Amino acid sequence: GGQGWPAGYRSIAVLQVVLTAILLVSLPLWKGQRTDAGAGEAPDKPLTLREIFRIPGAKEVMIAFFCYSAVEQTTSLWASSYLALHAGFSTEQAAGFASLFFIGITVGRAFSGFLTIRMDDPQIIRLGQGVIAVGIIALLLPLGEFFTLVGLILIGLGCAPVFPCIIHSTPAHFGADRSQAVIGVQMASAYIGTCVMPPLFGLIANHINVAWFPVYLILSLAVMVWMHEMLLKKSGQRLS
């Protein structure tokens, strides 16, 4: 509205304060969700990597985390390039509109705690995956600039609950005595996905076409959904 960058910074500051307040209010909702995991004592010695891999569902959750990071980080790093080089936005517009993805994540994380009142972790993860899928489809189909931007917001909203819910559900899937070790390899998988998958898409964008961006995301999402469903099956946590 012609007020310049100081007004923009003030608006962002107000938004951050509001979202922080919402996050603080929602914290008890996350803590209030009980799990049926065994409350075993921590093992006397740490599990080796080989022992962790032998736990039913461990490999699946690692791949799911890897693919989640692929979706989130590839979107965060390449959305602006996709908007500028394929969707028809100017460089300045693309740089600004790419932030809609982060707004989606921030708002989604703020409200994720409230979802636990009605839903458990697998349900919330599935909901997030569904929202991500809708967002990617909005990017993939030639629906116009408006729906492209809506797609970025939806991808952010869908990503928001997946990471915390996978972590939160770890004791339920693997038991309290194994959860610390499994969370460690989950985080390692997430970091590997962050380091590997965005540069891999960079090669695709440079040598083929940046238009493959939504296809790359939907393939990563498909593997994540598959691995999460396999995890639920192996851990006996299938939803009725």
Language-model features, listed with the residues they occupy:
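Symmetry-related core transmembrane helices of the 12-TM Major Facilitator Superfamily/SLC fold
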Residues: 7-26, 214-230
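Flexible cytoplasmic inter-helical loops of multi-pass small-molecule transporters
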Residues: 25-50, 240
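Extracytoplasmic gate region of multi-pass secondary transporters
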Residues: 56-99, 103-106
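Helix-to-loop junctions at the C-terminal end of transmembrane segments
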Residues: 108-120, 205
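Structural signature of the two symmetry-related core transmembrane helices
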Residues: 123-138
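Paired small-residue
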Residues: 135, 146-154
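Intracellular juxtamembrane helix-capping segments at the cytosolic ends
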Residues: 161-174
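A late C-terminal transmembrane helix in Major Facilitator Superfamily
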Residues: 173-210
